[in-house]
Amino acid sequence: MTYVLGIDLGTSSLKGILMDEVGNLITTKSAEYQIDTPKQGYSEQRPEYWIVALESVLTGLSVEISDFGQQLAGISFSGQMHSLVVLDDNNKPVYPAILWNDVRTSKQCQEITDRLGQRLLEITKNIALEGFTLPKILWLQENEPEVWSRVKKIMLPKDYLSLWLTGNIYTEFSDAAGTLLLDIEKKQWSEEITDAFNIDRRILPELIESTDRTGFVKAEIAERYKLTNEVKVFAGGADNAAAALGVGLINEEVGLISMGTSGVVSAYEPKIADYKGKLHFFNHTVPGACYSMGVTLAAGNSLNWYKETFGKGLSFNELLSEVYTVSPGSEGLLFTPYIVGERTPHFDSKIRGSFIGISAHHEQKHFSRAVLEGITFSLRDSKDIMEKTKNKKFKRLISVGGGAQNPDIMQMQADIFNSEMIRLTVEQGPGLGACMIAAFGCGLFDSLEAVTKAFVHYKEASFIPNPKNVARYEQIYQIWKQVYKNTSEISHQLVEFNDEG
């Protein structure tokens, strides 16, 4: 038996997934760490938190699995995107990692937009947002010049783990694509962007494919965990790219709907596509491919907010128990899930959520259904942009996250998206994609398609659109789409009013 290990470096925890060479799950281990918020809007972590967590996971695996050390062949990673790690000439961190959800960089985003204009979108296929890496670099240059003077290498979080394991510094294209420094099409660091902001390209890591080897586990670490083989380490991928691989997003026929705190719609892209900044566009873990991604900022978050505000004391099952006695369209009640602003397709941080069409006959069950429908309508915005731009409709959509556990929500998705919906037998998230990269890299399979066939499995039952419901949803969705343009100015005025208070 041969084992491969996928390490998923998340925002609040690190998870290790151990699988065998035919795709059977052996076990999982995880370790949590803190997020530091020294000031409002700041979100940081010390890279050593991640190392402590990785050590804990490796220890747990070596204790639980008796032949872990003898059978482990390869390790790969998935990791939180965009977060900035800066090292000195001894490869030691000189500043806490500034995380993807840190929002201190609004000024720097405007500087990037003003200086590069349309060229930023042409080169990186993305617009400047606080989450990306380049604004964090500029903030460090401007606000911590002494720290910046000591920076000899810039890294991304998962690559710091690879450095610790192997002693080598690399990154791969799916994570580099989230920095705003990568020329997506040429697959190289952009001279135009680095020159514009006085960034020495020598401090950027060497670029390789997700499936390329970064090295071998160092002897002292191998000895500590009794690894008897020369364990290979592979570059891995950004969390969303690894998650896409881990659900089988390796061709254009399927799309991915993921509903967690935020909602994500992803599509495989065999070549460069021009979404004109309406969607995120990144290199994939599949060599030579890309993926597009639309984001609903508050998907599950809207449902959680609704429950805590209007259903306190109720379980989710109780809150939603009567939703399916209400007809599609919630009898004329609409909800927009813009409670923290919105990403796709509006990129509007000052838009706010709303219930529209409240009537005297509406009960809690109508509001509950309207929330679910509003979240799904927002996800449909992204799906429709993808299909219209590609002029190609998805044959099936894979649903993961909280919504995939509820058959009624799955049917609602099928009806609103007008697409067959399928589910995984077991969800393991980005870490599964990392395992798949390690399995391919170790030569256990001759293609990522073969790995996918062995590692990714779907439930037999799917959810088929109901034509009557599809027609009703098409009608109400066209009305729902008008809410943004008719409430955005009011929302902006309300945000300004609240800020003044």
From Swiss-Prot:
Catalytic activity: D-xylulose + ATP = D-xylulose 5-phosphate + ADP + H(+)
Binding residues annotated for substrate, in chain numbering: 81-82
Cysteines joined through disulfide linkages: none
The entry's keywords: ATP-binding, Carbohydrate metabolism, Kinase, Nucleotide-binding, Transferase, Xylose metabolism
HAMAP family in the record: XylB
Uppermost EC category: transferase
Function: Catalyzes the phosphorylation of D-xylulose to D-xylulose 5-phosphate.
Protein name (record): Xylulose kinase
Entry's EC annotation: 2.7.1.17
Site (Important for activity): 8
PANTHER family named among the record's database cross-references: SUGAR KINASE (PTHR43095), XYLULOSE KINASE (PTHR43095:SF5)
One GO-annotated biological process of the protein: xylulose catabolic process
Gene3D superfamilies: 3.30.420.40
Active-site residue numbers: 239
Record organism: Lactococcus lactis subsp. lactis (strain IL1403)
InterPro entries listed in its UniProt record: ATPase_NBD, Carb_kinase_FGGY, Carb_kinase_FGGY_CS, FGGY_C, FGGY_Carb_Kinase, FGGY_N, Xylulokinase
Family: Belongs to the FGGY kinase family.
Molecular function via GO: ATP binding; D-xylulokinase activity
UniProt keyword annotation of Transit peptide present: no
Keyword Repressor: no
